[in-house]
Amino acid sequence: MDLFNYFRRETTEVNIGAVPLGGPNSIRVQSMTNTSTQDTQACVEQAKRIVDAGGEYVRLTTQGIKEAENLMNINIGLRSQGYMVPLVADVHFNPKVADVAAQYAEKVRINPGNYVDAARTFKKLEYTDEEYAQEIQKIHDRFVPFLNICKKNHTAIRIGVNHGSLSDRIMSRYGDTPAGMVESCMEFLRICVEENFTDVVISIKASNTVVMVKTVRLLVDVMEKEGMAFPLHLGVTEAGDGEDGRIKSALGIGALLSDGLGDTCLLYTSPSPRDP
């Protein structure tokens, strides 16, 4: 890294609807709705406000099958009014929801910490090498069908790791560390590479900005060693509201942007996505 000459990391281009990410494209800005994803009209109106304020992607919480299915209606509502913004489905815990969302959203976010592995319970703290390998095979067996759905529907994905939701399996081997967060992400990226699926964006977030910055830098180093150049989504989880949240987000995101890292930024630190 050259401290005196800015150089942006070269990444692969990812197709997300009509708004590509990474590669030669500018750093994209996105925000997230805080409306119920089952409320079509409320989501459409808030998404329009995000776009009018400069947002290039709109992310929606997608807790269940009903929310995933309603993404179709939200998409129709936006496009009927001339808003072609790509929608991003934010999925947790249930891979079946991701399968449905991939049919209607332009991008689907999954969390490696709870996509296949059970939520963190601390009930199983030790895994043999054989057990560990079996769990990774389970991820492969469940993740590949999802990738095939995404290929069929031209849907991109974001592999989004959160510091607070690492699985028991990762915790058993790496602890609550940047290395554990990176490996949680890399397990999924390696499968994407094996399956020749390249429309992938990645994120690693933590509420502690120091941990977040250190982990993203480590991830980039590991990816480069394995010949990967996937684009980065930057954000600080649980940044907080108001001025404190904006300062915290700016510190974490700004440090990485100054390193030349980052292809899109998620900003949502106010009650309404458009509020200052």
Map each language-model feature to its residues.
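Glycine-rich tight-turn/loop motif centered on a GG-T
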Residues: E106-R142, R169-G180
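Glycine-rich, proline-tolerant flexible connector loops at the mouths of alpha/beta enzymes
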Residues: G55-I74, N114-K123, E130-E131, S203-S207
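Conserved, mostly hydrophobic/aromatic
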Residues: V29, D90, I159, I202, ...
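Active-site-adjacent loop and "lid" segments of alpha/beta metabolic enzymes
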Residues: R169-V182, F230-D259
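Alpha-helix-loop-beta-strand connector modules within alpha/beta enzyme cores
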Residues: A68-L87, D141-I149, V222-E226
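Single conserved hydrophobic/aromatic residue that forms the stacking wall/gate
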Residues: Y268-P276
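N-terminal amphipathic alpha-helix/helix-capping segment at the start of soluble metabolic enzymes
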Residues: M1-Q30
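Active-site mouth loops of central-metabolism enzymes
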Residues: I27-A42, V88-A89, M171-G180, G240-G245
